[in-house]
């Protein structure tokens, strides 16, 4: 299943292709490498509580809630019918979902959590969609006391791959909703201003970082 999701405020939140549940063998191979690196970095962070910003339909937060047992896991995302439908299907006793206030069209407002409320704050395939990624990362760092775990598409590779498969030619291969584009080096530079980049992984075609605060 795929499509373009637009929030109630008219914000394109991206292509909603279900990469975690895809039956395509190529996608499955790419996602296996992605999830392996993600699991390894999550284990290195060893959190007892997690905030996932832009949690989507709840695939990852449900997994993390099961892994943490009684540890608190909170997923937050925009109000959108398909997202909340996913939340209804993915529940756990220690898992909580919150609807994010979109605020003005040019930025995402402050996260509704206290300073150092979580061990880990994550944004997995999210920062490319937000109008002000610097503000979003700053808010994540405020809410987390130990680590950030983040991933984004690696550019210009991502757009080149889109064009190679004949997708989004009119946008030069840019996926709908992708407002920001980072090479591995430029993404490391962005996150380095918020903490020590402890691990950098490059599962094709993404960049994934674990940042120590």
Per-region residue spans from a language model:
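Conserved N-terminal segment of class I S-adenosyl-L-methionine
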Residues: 1-114, 137, 164-195, 199-213
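A short glycine-rich, Lys/Arg-flanked "PGG" loop and its adjoining helix->strand segment in the class I
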Residues: 134-148
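Hydrophobic adenine-recognition pocket in adenosine-nucleotide-binding enzymes
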Residues: 126
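Conserved class I S-adenosyl-L-methionine
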Residues: 149-171
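Histidine-centered divalent metal-coordination motifs
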Residues: 129
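A conserved beta-strand element that flanks and buttresses the S-adenosyl-L-methionine
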Residues: 122
């Amino acid at each position: 299943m795929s499509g373009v999701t637009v929030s109630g405020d008219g914000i394109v939140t991206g292509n909603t292709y279900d990469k975690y549940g895809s039956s395509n063998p190529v996608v499955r191979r790419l996602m296996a490498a992605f999830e392996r690196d993600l699991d390894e970095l999550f284990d290195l962070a060893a959190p007892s509580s997690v905030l996932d910003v832009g949690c989507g339909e709840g695939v990852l937060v449900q997994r993390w809630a099961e892994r943490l047992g009684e540890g608190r896991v909170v997923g937050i995302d925009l109000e959108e019918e398909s997202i909340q439908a996913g939340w209804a299907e993915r529940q756990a006793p220690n898992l909580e979902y919150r609807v994010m206030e979109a605020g003005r069209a040019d930025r995402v407002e402050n996260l509704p959590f206290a300073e150092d409320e979580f061990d880990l704050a994550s944004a997995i395939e999210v920062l490319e969609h937000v109008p002000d990624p610097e503000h979003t990362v700053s808010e994540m760092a405020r809410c987390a006391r130990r680590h950030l775990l983040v991933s984004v598409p690696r550019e210009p590779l991502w757009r080149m791959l889109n064009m190679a498969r004949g997708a989004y030619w009119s946008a030069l291969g840019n996926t709908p909703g992708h407002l920001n584009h980072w090479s591995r080096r430029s993404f490391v530079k962005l996150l380095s201003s918020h903490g020590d980049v402890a691990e950098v992984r490059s599962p094709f075609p993404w960049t994934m970082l674990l940042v120590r605060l």
